[in-house]
From Swiss-Prot:
It holds the Pfam family CTU2. The gene is NCS2. This is Cytoplasmic tRNA 2-thiolation protein 2. Plays a central role in 2-thiolation of mcm(5)S(2)U at tRNA wobble positions of tRNA(Lys), tRNA(Glu) and tRNA(Gln). May act by forming a heterodimer with NCS6 that ligates sulfur from thiocarboxylated URM1 onto the uridine of tRNAs at wobble position. Prior mcm(5) tRNA modification by the elongator complex is required for 2-thiolation. May also be involved in protein urmylation. HAMAP family: CTU2. It comes from Vanderwaltozyma polyspora (strain ATCC 22028 / DSM 70294 / BCRC 21397 / CBS 2163 / NBRC 10782 / NRRL Y-8283 / UCD 57-17). The lineage of its organism: Eukaryota, Fungi, Dikarya, Ascomycota, Saccharomycotina. GO terms for cellular component: cytosol.
Amino acid sequence: MSDSHSHSDILLCQRCNKNHASVISRKEKFCTDCFRNFVSLKQRKQMMSDQYYQDIFKVMYKDKLRSEQDAHLQNLNSKILVPLSFGSSSLVMLDILNDTLLEQSITHRGKTGFTVDVIICFHDEQIQNQIKENVSKLINAKYKENNQKIKFHLVDINQFFDNSPHLQSLVLQETDFLIKSLNLKDQSIIEKKLTLSEILDQCSDRSTYQDLLAFVTKHAIKKYAFQHDFKAILWGHSMTRLADEVISLIVKGRGSAISSSLNTDDFDENYGNKFKNLYPLKDILLTEIDAYCYNSGLHNYLINYNIQDALLVNKINQNTDKIQTNSLKNKTINELARNYFEVIEGDYSNVISTVVRTGDKLAEPKSQENFKISKCNLCMQKIYSDPSQWITSITENKGHPLETDEEKENYQRWKNYNNDKLKNSEMDFFRLNEFVKENGSKACLCYGCTITLNTFKDKSVVWPVHDDKELNSVLEDYVLTDHEE
């Protein structure tokens, strides 16, 4: 008897006991169809997690609570927003939503309980053509039957600054770590940096860059949901992604935001209490999502993402043992946390689920005594204690006195160099500080954003004023179809 059979030939699916196994996950062997069902059921369970979400996703009929017309309107108005990044998670989540719509249409004779609007955010025009091409392929290959139920929208997040009615300059005072805000409406003396790229260019490290980009993207998505009356935003975050988010928030000094960021029960109060946020993939590991993505052919639509083949019986990556050459110094905090969870995901996946469950159990922090809860002018998170007071208490601001002639000479050189810079600049950090001290007003930044602002080249950033005018300023979108070029 020949021993030349591949490993997959001798492995049978433990669910159906018929087909060859293509995935091994949680110590169980799955064929492709059974694994798709396994992942799909976990997502659908989250979609039915409480009455609010059941009313969105179920097909409604006339009953004791609603008339036939009311049921029809509820089905029609059950709109959900799906952010698509073209990573594996958001593609898989959308694929399962598409399957759900197809099943509802067949079972309920053309009726469905909800519609899907997909939002794709970008700030780099170079990637725009690739996005359009992928969307066109997706519609034709995957979503042709649901082209009236699934719509794709492209949003340029540079509008974050372009369409903001009021801009402010947030400036960090180095001596006391207080934040001052300068209204730029009538301050033509200060250059307005209106594009996102200009703001991101001020970031001194990749962590700050990614944090700001993530916030602007999330704000654009939630603002779009607010303006178009969506019932819920479905975020394609895996259990692994949520775990690394929890750890990263703690490391960045944003631990107080964990409770609100994982909250799926309450309406989003920063956006008019109009919608809720749901994480349908929160019970699924990233490696499981990647396996689903590959076996379903969704890997052909990925942008800037590499599939992990850890759970696949037949590996797809030839250099699985290749050592990553990226320096730890060049990694963001989120990337470091993600790398850790990727390493332990195989043998210690319970650690990941424990982190997410613990984050879910965290309640909103209590405010510091005699401190009125406020909101951060930058990230909009609640502030429960005065960060500047705490930073000042642990910081030594007085320098060592100059003693030797060499120290005095070096100090004079430094002073002359900076004076020359001051003369050649219309409004650099030193002048801006003095100007803001006299003309600015006190602003509120959380601890995490205070630390972030400290990494900026001039300790300041131009930022929109988050108010009703900004929230209602129209966010333009471009509807993508199956014949985009």
